[in-house]
Amino acid sequence: MFQGASSLNLDAKGRMTIPARHRDALLLQCEGRITLTKHPDGCLLLFPRPVWEMRREEIAKWPISARAWQRIFLGNASDVDFDGAGRILIAPELRTAAGLTRDVMMMGMGGHFEIWDAARLAESESDAIAAGMPDVLNDFSF
């Protein structure tokens, strides 16, 4: 299970170094083979390839009424591998879709990661806090 936030930078070629704590786990779990795709919240999703392959099968079975969402998730999926320095190359189309510039955040979300433009994530979190807790979390406490 992946958790935690990492503040990272994209280089001029659109490469991002995976933090060592996650890189080691991803190398063990999937030999550094991952899949990136769009998320409608304005970020990218990063899945270990075996996890993505299960998700891909589920998404492919969605009814025709969900075709646009299949296009968003499957049509934008990009398989990538770590390079020798533990970096991944994020395709220009995906960088543009998520508004990724130089400063990015990688958020562990259990079985996958979200990759956000740092400013966009800060705005999203601020909006969520201002909106208050959703009703579904009324009974949740630490």
Swiss-Prot record:
Major localization class: cytoplasm
Domain of life: Bacteria
A GO MF term: DNA-binding transcription factor activity
Keywords assigned by UniProt, alphabetized: Cytoplasm, DNA-binding, Repeat, Transcription, Transcription regulation
Subcellular location: Cytoplasm, Nucleoid
Pfam families linked: MraZ
Listed GO biological process terms: negative regulation of DNA-templated transcription initiation
UniProt entry tagged with the keyword Transcription regulation: yes
InterPro entries: MraZ, MraZ_C, MraZ_dom, MraZ_N, MraZ_sf, SpoVT-AbrB_dom, SpoVT-AbrB_sf
Cellular component per GO, a single term: cytoplasm
SpoVT-AbrB domain location: 5-51, 77-120
HAMAP family attached to this UniProt entry: MraZ
Family to which this protein belongs: Belongs to the MraZ family.
Subunit-level organization: Forms oligomers.
PANTHER family according to UniProt: TRANSCRIPTIONAL REGULATOR MRAZ (PTHR34701:SF1)
Protein name: Transcriptional regulator MraZ
Organism annotation: Herminiimonas arsenicoxydans
